[in-house]
Amino acid sequence: MGPTSPAARGQGRRWRPPPLPLLLPLSLLLLRAQLAVGNLAVGSPSAAEAPGSAQVAGLCGRLTLHRDLRTGRWEPDPQRSRRCLLDPQRVLEYCRQMYPELHIARVEQAAQAIPMERWCGGTRSGRCAHPHHEVVPFHCLPGEFVSEALLVPEGCRFLHQERMDQCESSTRRHQEAQEACSSQGLILHGSGMLLPCGSDRFRGVEYVCCPPPATPNPSGMAAGDPSTRSWPLGGRAEGGEDEEEVESFPQPVDDYFVEPPQAEEEEEEEEERAPPPSSHTPVMVSRVTPTPRPTDGVDVYFGMPGEIGEHEGFLRAKMDLEERRMRQINEVMREWAMADSQSKNLPKADRQALNEHFQSILQTLEEQVSGERQRLVETHATRVIALINDQRRAALEGFLAALQGDPPQAERVLMALRRYLRAEQKEQRHTLRHYQHVAAVDPEKAQQMRFQVQTHLQVIEERMNQSLGLLDQNPHLAQELRPQIQELLLAEHLGPSELDASVPGSSSEDKGSLQPPESKDDPPVTLPKGSTDQESSSSGREKLTPLEQYEQKVNASAPRGFPFHSSDIQRDELAPSGTGVSREALSGLLIMGAGGGSLIVLSLLLLRKKKPYGTISHGVVEVDPMLTLEEQQLRELQRHGYENPTYRFLEERP
């Protein structure tokens, strides 16, 4: 047989598949060719982006991309167009073209750029000159504008800016938020646009600023504008007193003042000025216990009064209350604007009812905020008075302890006396500043409380007179400390005479004619039933400590010997000597007085025989309404022959 041709040999054999080692390179080549022909830009969605959100992106000279709603991957334009997506109006048109089923109404540029891999710009080859790019996409948003809800982590602050005369892009508003946070030493945590005025144009921005990760404790950011800083949970700020006097509520409320500590006791011993041991307690508690702690200033002020200083707590609560009010008003205004845009086709009566509904919501909101303000002020006033009383009580206790030393040391007594006088002067300043504030916001109310304020200042001076009268028990010590005491009293003396000078427009001529306000609605002041019973008064006296009994006596007693005499209290020291009574008239008056006295004694003896257990009055005692509470206590104590145990203790000492 002759040799057969290759065709004949091929026809005689069956076809066999190529070996397996040849299939693997062929499949890889086919896959690479498909990727090159399709020219896909594989951009993995970032963690911050939802997989199915409608977005578009484009760079000049490269294929325009859009995001697939099902897979979340970036796909090239089906028509292989190359658009420069710079104008928001053109971006809106392209979004409507790529997502016709979503009814796109607006676009918004993303806050940060995202990476794009293998964006090769339509090349048929499998290689890219620049395989990686970063582009800022545009969000294609359907429906009306709704502001993004921002989360405020613990230690961060929520702020916002509105500029009705400027219509800027979202990128510019985002930059403004970053600059505002950076100016306070914070970093931007999140931002959202407010008040749209066009396609990707807005009149405001809301943002959240947080402390840097390297410094998680926000107490180091005390410097700066108090309206945007994170408030610490301890310590006091310098100069806070002036801030509180300026930043008062707009409505006439009774604001109170807590003075930040000043360098008043530089001469005191170092061990007496030790810092409180509980300054770092809140930090330790927050780390150990998993219970969430309130971050709002109002909740912290009402819920944890010991965690923060009174002055800082009141300022922070007042500021956070106003911020909360602004957030709630902005939310209501957004809902009102959305409802108004949706009700354009409704009848006029329905639209008017809708407006009245939102107006009632705003009015209710203002009433709630006003109630919170009043509650905040009342709580602050109560705590201020308690702080002042505690400071004065502690200072008085130290002064009594220094006097009871054996022998009393002049330096220690002077130091304790200085602390006590400063506590009393602080109460005087607080009373005057409160009166000045009320006179500025409500002159009528200030005129009504004028008599009470002057009486309170007189009581403070009487209390100082009685306390300094204790020095008479040691004449040598009183003579030695007399010059220093005079300097302390004259250095910063605030008495009833300062009341006229504290309010502009007041005259000193009205001081003598000052009368208590007449009010028909005020009920007559009555003493409690137990005040007339000797047994109940003695039992109540046993429950009091010697210091409390002394304070009651000092608050209601007349001045004794004291080197400082106020001209506003002791007005009758120089009696006129030009008046006199004839001898005949004097003898007649003495005879009539003796006869009347004998009748009174006889009547008392008869009544005592009828009532061997004494008189116990269970009725209402008529009290002169001109008397203050301290003067009423003075009369009642003098009726029962009350003696100060402190005086007796000092007099019976050897």
Swiss-Prot record:
Binding-site residues for Cu(2+) 1, renumbered to this chain: H174
Cytoplasmic side, ranges: 608-654
Binding locations of Zn(2+) 1: E206, C209, C210
Note: Binds zinc and copper in the extracellular domain. Zinc-binding increases heparin binding. No Cu(2+) reducing activity with copper-binding.
Region (Disordered): 214-297, 497-580
Known function: May play a role in postsynaptic function. The C-terminal gamma-secretase processed fragment, ALID1, activates transcription activation through APBB1 (Fe65) binding. Couples to JIP signal transduction through C-terminal binding. May interact with cellular G-protein signaling pathways. Can regulate neurite outgrowth through binding to components of the extracellular matrix such as heparin and collagen I. The gamma-CTF peptide, C30, is a potent enhancer of neuronal apoptosis.
Chief location bin: membrane
Keywords on record: Apoptosis, Cell adhesion, Cell membrane, Copper, Cytoplasm, Disulfide bond, Endocytosis, Glycoprotein, Heparin-binding, Membrane, Metal-binding, Neurodegeneration, Signal, Transmembrane, Transmembrane helix, Zinc
Site residues (Cleavage), renumbered to this chain: D624, P625
Short sequence motif named Basolateral sorting signal, residue ranges: 608-619
Stretches for region Interaction with DAB2: 640-654
Binding positions (Cu(2+) 2): H565
Protein name according to UniProt: Amyloid beta precursor like protein 1
Record field: compositional bias (Acidic residues): 262-272
Modifications after synthesis and translation: Proteolytically cleaved by caspases during neuronal apoptosis. Cleaved, in vitro, at Asp-624 by caspase-3.
Annotated motif NPXY motif, positions: 644-647
Transmembrane stretches, start-end: 585-607
Organism: Mus musculus (Mouse)
